[in-house]
Amino acid sequence: MKLLIALLALVTAAIAQNGFGQGGYGGQGGFGGFGGLGGQAGFGGQIGFNGQGGVGGQVGIGQGGVHPGQGGFAGQGSPNQYQPGYGNPVGSGHFHGGNPVESGHFHGNPHEYPEHHGEHHREHHEHHGHHEHHGHHRH
């Protein structure tokens, strides 16, 4: 068992080096939006834990890949977050297979994105429409 634990520790170190937060960490959405949460290359990234899918498989938390329009598979990452010193193959924009997986940088609640708030408020306003009050006419 000790050998396995040591192996896991080594793999984890490799992940931190190669994938952890390299393409993700705010990802495409900046705000941590729909690219940061699932991250772009994220925790298992491309290399490391399990090769292709890493720790969280293909989609991670679900935000990274489910909303491609929001920066899911765009593979841009946040250029400011890329640390070139590592020289890792999973950098900002270089995703060999594009697994949006990251577990570590969760920027707030995935349900608290401004894009969604507008829709909910609009629904509420539509229901409270015109209430006509008809007076009682006394003859």
UniProtKB/Swiss-Prot annotation:
Biased composition (Basic residues): 122-139
Start-end of Gly residues biased regions: 60-75
Disulphides: none
Domain of life according to the entry: Eukaryota
Record's keyword terms, sorted: Developmental protein, Secreted, Signal
Residues in the signal sequence: 1-16
Compartments, as annotated in UniProt: Secreted
Gene Ontology CC, one term: extracellular region
Ranges where the record places region Disordered: 60-139
Biased composition (Basic and acidic residues): 109-121
General function of this protein: Likely to be involved in the establishment of the head.
Annotated protein name in UniProt: Protein spalt-accessory
